[in-house]
């Protein structure tokens, strides 16, 4: 077994116990990876290492654990206090493996002030004041190490006696970190390669994975990285990631060769790599992401001055986005269009991310994409991509198949995102525009529009009210009277309730039942007030949306009205915490970026429902022949090389409640709701889709409304789609 030490990189998801995600996403995609890889990073080990890193220097900690090897087979057994220890052995004589005389036990158990002399019979136990290095040194030679201190290092800690004998000794919080006396370690099965967070390089065939990325600052052992890497270089125990990938993923990779890594190459037997493994089915549940470190350069004041760059890190950007857009690391690009706004590829990187921070810090920043700053950034250079990892996109944030609502303030590039991102897939029907509902669509459908009514309402207010309200909303005058702004917010809420809430309620079926729908809104109140049964996600983006509103003066009512509208919508919103809108964008478009980057050839596979012809005829419809009519509930796609026989023979547990109106609109409701996580992992789901008849529909004349319940199954329809190579 080859052991590879991994010090997690920045933003490593500790909730995911699979360390493969922090190395390279391809390790997760090879067949039977769980049979080839083992991960040794138990919770007790991380907790002990974190506590030891506080009291020991990096060099002391490395020295303390140098003789501990993976897997750890020893355990620490925590003894009770002297009086309770004696009482335990009296109550359970079979536990007296030290043959302590009964007279000694009785004296200790009945004494008001017992001494610790009874522990002299426990030969080799760890004393209460023992150093952590001392506790670690006991691990390698003994199966069970008895200890009188809970501060140990190198093996899991369990109770030596039942929990009742520790009353008054350990608090409930301390007990939560100690295993019960009946606990036994899980059997560790050795595999071809074992990944671990135990930073010990003394065992044979143990190497340090040399990932070029910042360490996770929340992991205390990150401070050990320079020292640990220096030791690995001296002992020739560095493991380059490309060497690991060549051995396990693709023998065609050309790793760099140097004397420092000769032992790792020999250990992996790179001269005789295995044949490349290809999975029998693509997994659409996971999307690889990385953190992009960029340098933003402002306009120079003169020709001789070279202004300093601002370094930022864009977190959790889909790795395939840069591949599809043909963006090169290390190359400098213009940041803005002639209009002054950011170039589309940079906007998409920001909108699909989780956060933007100043590189080297945890300070989040919001970028001003409009050309509004005193010295705006004009050039961008991607320095490197770090912290590659895999995120699951089927489990959330959208949970069910039918519809989801994303709330974003004005100026959040909702229309830009929906127009620009699907254009990357000209050959693929990724988005059905009829299944996207814009945040302003409802207000614009009124006559006069909602924004026009709001402008009329502002005109009825006393002179100066709007100006004073804007100063307060923009916080340019902290001491200003907020009465004017409160008046506008109250009037806005009354206006909204009088005309928008009922209109929103009337279009509930269109929002929630026409297929897989993406609904945009300004606030979650818009859905909650109208009782719309839809999952609502309060989104946030790493962009200053207020500056974008100011940079768009041609909207209804001008900048002033738009700023007040934005403020009123934000005051309507609930106090629920926001989440990155990029998480939803990655869920919808991330698997398609992966397919585009790999130049996959796709073929349609549809989720279908059947409507009996006799039911349609009973409602006055004229139908050709007696075969059931097929509804394409959702047209998905799969790779032509995937084997999906199990998909075509499965029936979903949910049933479709189908309503067909006289004007041909098809509404589908799932009972129970259909979770995305239960759908086949090899299927590419469209970002949005509207249910349609499967051609040919065979409907000659329409009739009255029809409602029917149908099962859901999968069928292959249509012809394969060839995918153009990636690039702008």
From Swiss-Prot:
Keywords: Capsid protein, Host cytoplasm, Host cytoskeleton, Outer capsid protein, Virion. GO terms for cellular component: host cell cytoplasm; host cytoskeleton; viral outer capsid. It is found in: Virion; Host cytoplasm, Host cytoskeleton. It holds the Pfam family Reovirus_Mu2. One of its GO terms (molecular function) is structural molecule activity. The keyword Cytoplasm does not apply. Belongs to the reoviridae microtubule-associated protein family. Minor inner capsid component. Displays NTPase and RNA 5'-triphosphatase (RTPase) activities. May function as a cofactor of polymerase. Associates with microtubules and plays a role in the formation, structural organization and morphology of viral inclusions, where the assembly of cores and the replication of viral RNA occur. This is Microtubule-associated protein VP5. The lineage of its organism: Viruses, Riboviria, Orthornavirae, Duplornaviricota, Resentoviricetes.
């Amino acid at each position: 077994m080859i052991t590879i030490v991994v010090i997690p990189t920045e933003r490593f998801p500790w909730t995911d116990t699979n360390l493969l995600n922090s190395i390279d996403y391809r390790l997760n995609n090879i067949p039977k990876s769980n049979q080839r890889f083992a991960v040794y990073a138990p919770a007790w080990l991380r907790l002990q290492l974190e506590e030891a890193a506080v009291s020991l220097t990096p060099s002391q900690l490395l020295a303390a654990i140098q003789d501990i090897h993976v897997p750890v087979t020893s355990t620490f057994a925590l003894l009770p206090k002297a009086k309770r220890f004696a009482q335990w052995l009296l109550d359970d004589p079979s536990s007296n493996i030290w043959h302590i005389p009964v007279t000694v036990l009785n004296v200790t158990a009945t004494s008001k002030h017992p001494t610790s002399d009874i522990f002299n019979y426990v030969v080799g136990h760890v004393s209460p004041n023992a150093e952590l290095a001392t506790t670690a040194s006991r691990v390698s030679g003994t199966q069970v190490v008895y200890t009188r201190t809970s501060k140990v290092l190198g093996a899991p800690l369990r109770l030596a006696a039942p929990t009742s004998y520790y009353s008054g000794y350990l608090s409930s919080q301390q007990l939560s970190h100690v295993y019960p006396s009946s606990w036994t370690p899980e059997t560790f099965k050795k595999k071809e390669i074992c990944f671990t967070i135990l930073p010990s390089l003394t065992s044979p065939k143990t190497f340090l994975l040399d990932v070029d990325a910042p360490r996770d600052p929340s992991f205390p052992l990150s401070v050990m990285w320079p020292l640990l890497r220096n030791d690995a270089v001296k002992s020739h125990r560095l493991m380059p990631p490309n060497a690991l990938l060549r051995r396990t993923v693709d023998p065609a990779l050309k790793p760099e060769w140097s004397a420092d890594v000769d032992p790792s190459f020999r250990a992996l037997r790179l001269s005789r790599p295995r044949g490349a493994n290809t999975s029998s089915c693509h997994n659409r549940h996971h999307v690889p992401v990385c953190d992009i470190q960029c340098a933003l350069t402002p306009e120079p004041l003169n020709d001789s001055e070279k202004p300093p760059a601002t370094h930022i890190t864009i977190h959790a950007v889909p790795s395939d986005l840069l591949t599809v857009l043909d963006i090169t690391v290390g190359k400098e690009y213009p940041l803005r269009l002639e209009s002054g706004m950011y170039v589309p590829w940079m906007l998409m990187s920001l909108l699909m991310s989780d956060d933007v921070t100043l590189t080297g810090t945890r300070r989040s920043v919001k970028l001003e994409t409009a050309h509004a700053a005193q010295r705006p950034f004009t050039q961008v250079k991607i320095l490197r991509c770090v912290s590659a990892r895999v995120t699951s996109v089927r489990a959330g944030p959208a949970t069910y198949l039918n519809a989801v609502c994303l709330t974003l303030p004005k100026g959040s590039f909702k229309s830009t995102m929906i127009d620009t991102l699907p254009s990357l897939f000209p050959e693929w029907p990724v988005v059905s525009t009829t299944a996207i509902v814009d945040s302003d669509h409802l207000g614009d459908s009124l006559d006069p529009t909602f924004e026009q009514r709001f402008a009329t309402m502002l005109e009825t207010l006393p002179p100066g009210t709007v100006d004073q309200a804007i100063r307060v909303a923009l916080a340019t005058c902290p001491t200003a009277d907020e009465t004017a702004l409160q008046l506008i917010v109250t009037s806005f809420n009354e206006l909204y309730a009088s005309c928008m809430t009922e209109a929103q309620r009337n279009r509930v079926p269109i929002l929630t039942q026409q297929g897989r729908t993406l609904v945009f809104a300004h606030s979650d109140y818009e859905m909650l007030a109208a009782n719309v049964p839809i999952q609502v996600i309060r989104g946030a983006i790493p962009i200053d949306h207020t500056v974008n509103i100011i940079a768009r003066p041609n909207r209804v009512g001008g900048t002033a009205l738009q700023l007040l509208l934005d403020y009123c919508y934000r005051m309507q919103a609930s106090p629920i915490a926001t989440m990155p809108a990029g998480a939803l964008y990655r869920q919808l478009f991330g698997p398609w970026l992966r397919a585009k980057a790999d130049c996959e050839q796709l073929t349609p596979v549809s989720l279908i429902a059947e409507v009996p012809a006799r039911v349609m005829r009973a409602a006055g419809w004229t139908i050709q022949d007696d075969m059931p009519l097929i509804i394409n509930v959702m047209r998905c796609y799969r790779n032509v090389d995937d084997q999906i026989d199990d998909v075509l023979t499965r029936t979903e547990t949910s049933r479709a409640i189908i309503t067909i109106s006289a004007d041909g609109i098809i509404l589908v409701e799932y009972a129970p709701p259909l979770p995305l996580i239960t759908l086949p992992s090899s299927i590419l789901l469209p970002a949005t889709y509207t249910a349609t008849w499967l051609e040919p529909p065979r409907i000659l004349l329409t009739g009255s409304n029809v409602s029917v319940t149908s099962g859901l199954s999968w069928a292959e329809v249509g012809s394969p789609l060839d995918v153009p190579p990636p690039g702008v």
